[in-house]
Amino acid sequence: MNNADRLKRQKSIRNFSIIAHIDHGKSTLADRILEKTGALTSREMKDQTLDAMDLERERGITIKLNAVQLKYTAKDGEEYILHLIDTPGHVDFTYEVSRSLAACEGAVLVVDAAQGIEAQTLANVYLALDNDLEILPIINKIDLPSADVERVRQEIEDVIGLDASEAVPTSAKAGIGIEEILEQIVAKVPAPTGDPEAPLEALIFDSYYDAYRGVVASIRVVNGTVKVGDKIRMMSTGKDFEVLELAVSTPKPLRQKELTVGDVGTLSASIKTVGDVRVGDTITLAKQPAQEALPGYRKMNPMVYCGLYPIDAARYNDLREALERLQLSDAALEFEPETSQALGFGFRCGFLGMLHMEIIQERIEREFNIDMITTAPSVIYHVTTTAGEVLHVDNPSKMPEQQKVEFIEEPYVKAAVMTPNDYVGAIMELCQKKRGTFIDMEYIDTTRVKITYELPLSEIVYDFFDQLKSSTKGYASLDYELIGYQQSRLVKMDILLNNENVDALSFIVHRDFAYERGKVIVDKLKELIPRMQFEVPIQAAVGTKIVARSTIKALRKNVLAKCYGGDISRKRKLLEKQKEGKKRMKMVGSVEVPQEAFMSVLSMDED
């Protein structure tokens, strides 16, 4: 292709993504667009076409971003090339959204005609504005009986400040308004700017592992042209590779000889190791490198940590391989080896949130068939010791002793909850219970309120989302962002079984809740740990002070069964002898902790 053709083609490219709150109909809209542009025949169509993972289909959520190239002939008779980059909507996957937005010039903002604007809608709009994207609002689900298009139009203007006069009323399910959306994309989303002659600069916005081709990178070409056979260089590591294959997805992979400015496609170059392809890195040509890398996006830092241990210790290396594979396409997953006295060898893993953690665990169990024990999730605490050292503690068992700690700081988030105003009381009560500080409350319209609180991240991590949904019958939506660290009165709680500390059951708790929390867990463990031949005390301790205790009674044989009538001193002798035996047994006996017991401590419900 010569340069004039490249420039002509560049003018016809439109890169856009679809952003929305969970359940506002993003994946359905993507399906309809694929159908309308003839990318798939009706025989090949299935719901959630772009959600390739079984897990995504089952839960009805999008986890991974996906990119497809579509051809569309507009009403002006021109043929346009559209690159649709699908994005997730859940708060844990915000970084997936920011990655896909970095590869676009426009975003279609889907708002549910019945529900209106939700917390996540706002968060995604701000991400799109940060990336200077052209935002096209559309109002979806207009076929619902409870749809109120005019109210939502007004809401978009008042809350987000976008002009909604041209917002297309759509029903992705019924296929209404799809053509108008495509026409708006062609008319309003700018064509990519960039010079096909300049040195190559391509942004890696995703990658995955293929058993035959090694690591495959998804790229968006910003400047220059890349051809099969070119020697390319990764700018962050300086390593060189030869391009073996270029392709675009039309959902089916279609091989290309070259990718030029504005193209979104995949590149494979027999890259063997996962670490060589970093999401957010820039690819350039080895013989004519670009001066500087593209501004990648910020590194996402995990918010929640937990330990993963294989139940069968022999599968430790399999677990490592599974995590490495998942890390390829999931830039935010971090892990490092760790050992626990109770559970043996495993990994400490960092996740963006609880949903992210569940998804990764489920993928390891499904895709790699590894059964695991997980320890209670924990956040990173900053601990200042009396010696003036600052430690970053992500594992409660690494917390220094109480007397060596000067103070502990924990991460706080600013949480925005959007809710119908009937539930304001319930939400405020929940936030107060979770040690929240009230910041602000504003009415979006006559029926809906946005409440802002500052909360410790550790309180959100466990079950805040579930409790929020149940106290508002599922109507409230939540978005949160990290705002920094604040000092708190925190203590480490150890669980002792038969006077021995079980490190995997330790957790960090606020001093005011230590007694209640200890009592709940001790009682729960009492139900779950099987009875032994000897008595087992279960204790919850803060430092050297025991705050709660429960005892698992011993199983005992009836040694008096053979004494008919008989003298009391004879019976007493037998009972004393049994007591001695139990005492000896208690000295040497060890307590087996079943998997359910670890799990029970995780399900931190205090009811």
UniProtKB/Swiss-Prot annotation:
Keywords associated with the record: Cell membrane, GTP-binding, Hydrolase, Membrane, Nucleotide-binding, Protein biosynthesis
Biological source species: Exiguobacterium sibiricum (strain DSM 17290 / CCUG 55495 / CIP 109462 / JCM 13490 / 255-15)
The family this protein is said to belong to: Belongs to the TRAFAC class translation factor GTPase superfamily. Classic translation factor GTPase family. LepA subfamily.
Reaction(s) catalysed by this chain's protein: GTP + H2O = GDP + phosphate + H(+)
Residue ranges of coiled coil: none
Localization terms from the record: Cell membrane
Lipid bilayer topology: Peripheral membrane protein
InterPro entries in alphabetical order: EF-4, EFG_III/V, EFG_V-like, EFTu-like_2, G_TR_CS, LepA_C_sf, LepA_CTD, LepA_IV
Pfam families: EFG_C, GTP_EFTU, GTP_EFTU_D2, LepA_C
Predominant location: membrane
Signal peptide positions on this chain: none
Binding residues for GTP: 23-28, 140-143
Matching SUPFAM superfamilies: EF-G C-terminal domain-like, P-loop containing nucleoside triphosphate hydrolases, Translation proteins
Keyword GTP-binding applies: yes
Gene Ontology terms: cellular component: plasma membrane
Highest rank taxon of the organism: Bacteria
GO biological process, one term: positive regulation of translation
Keyword Protein biosynthesis recorded: yes
Gene3D superfamilies on file: 3.30.70.240, Elongation factor 4, C-terminal domain, Elongation Factor G (Translational Gtpase), domain 3, P-loop containing nucleotide triphosphate hydrolases, Translation factors
Protein name: Elongation factor 4
A molecular function GO annotation: GTPase activity
HAMAP family referenced in this protein's UniProt entry, alphabetically: LepA (MF_00071)
EC number: 3.6.5.n1
Function noted in UniProt: Required for accurate and efficient protein synthesis under certain stress conditions. May act as a fidelity factor of the translation reaction, by catalyzing a one-codon backward translocation of tRNAs on improperly translocated ribosomes. Back-translocation proceeds from a post-translocation (POST) complex to a pre-translocation (PRE) complex, thus giving elongation factor G a second chance to translocate the tRNAs correctly. Binds to ribosomes in a GTP-dependent manner.
